[in-house]
Regions:
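Sec-dependent N-terminal signal peptides
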Residues: 4-13
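Bacterial extracytoplasmic/cell-wall-associated proteins, especially those involved in peptidoglycan
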Residues: 15, 19-111
Length: 111
């Protein structure tokens, strides 16, 4: 756990203004949870960093939720399952976290 507190300020330096709304914190936590639930703290933080870096990149949406939920739709309105930036968002499974400890860890990193 000590490593988490040492690494977080370094990881999120320069991103303080990016995680402003509870909605963005929730979206980031969801992404960390679903992409890296079984990973180490470093792996979870890497997912957070990828997400935040995309927010800063002009090729991606400019919000955390926009990046996490970025996808393309067919003209019929159906999601193109191969276009999601993060696979968990388009896999058709429930996105509700089922592992409380992993969710709490993801939320801590996202905050």
């Amino acid at each position: 756990m000590r490593k988490l507190w040492i690494t977080l300020p370094i990881l999120f330096f320069g991103y303080v203004g990016q995680v402003e709304a509870n909605n963005d914190v929730h979206c980031l936590a969801e992404n960390i949870y679903h992409e890296a639930r079984g990973e180490s703290t470093a792996g979870k933080m890497a997912v957070a960093l990828v997400t935040l870096n995309r927010v800063k990149d002009k090729r991606f949406p400019d919000t955390i939720c926009g990046v996490v939920k970025q996808t393309k739709f067919y003209p019929s309105g159906r999601i193109d399952l191969h276009s999601c930036q993060f696979s968990w968002y388009c896999d058709g499974k429930s996105d509700k976290p089922r592992d409380k400890k992993c969710w709490d860890d993801a939320l801590l990193i996202a905050e």
